[in-house]
From Swiss-Prot:
Biased composition (Polar residues): 99-120
Organism of origin: Schizosaccharomyces pombe (strain 972 / ATCC 24843) (Fission yeast)
Major site of localization recorded for this protein: membrane
Region (Disordered): 99-128
Protein name: Putative uncharacterized membrane protein C622.07
Subcellular compartments: Membrane
TM region positions: 33-53, 61-81
GO annotation, cellular component aspect: endoplasmic reticulum; membrane
Length: 128
């Protein structure tokens, strides 16, 4: 059975990109844990039905207690993972950093031709 490793990040000066990367990793783990808890809840309902029919014999009661403790443990682990996600201090530096030359593509929606710098236009005029 795989063990769950909880990594707490103590580093205070994470950049926005590092915070996003860590948050994505933690959200993947949280989603997996929530899927496991859904399976545990489904099994818990099956055991509840069996216990209702058989009036709680020893093994079914043990399974019921084990599944309930499993669901509670998973919920506590999800809360710990959610709390340990680092929050970025300054996201504006990361968001304002130009990633490419086409960063402001959505701003120019008109049919006008692109504006060139004056030096480039001067060179074109000289060639004619």
């Amino acid at each position: 059975m795989a063990s769950l490793d909880i990594h707490l990040y103590v580093k205070k000066d994470l950049t926005y990109g590092e915070c996003v990367r860590v948050a994505k990793e933690k959200y993947k783990i949280i989603h997996r844990l929530l899927y496991i808890s859904i399976i545990f809840l489904f099994l818990n309902y099956v055991v509840d039905i069996v216990c209702y029919v058989k009036n709680y014999n020893g093994f079914s009661f043990f399974c019921w207690v084990f599944l309930n403790l499993g669901v509670i443990g998973i919920i506590i682990t999800v809360i710990i993972y959610y709390i340990s996600i680092p929050k970025p201090d300054a996201e504006s530096e990361f968001l304002n950093k130009p990633d490419s030359l086409n960063q402001n593509v959505g701003e120019s929606q008109s049919n006008e031709p692109p504006k060139y710098t004056s030096t480039f236009m001067d060179e074109l005029d000289k060639q004619d």
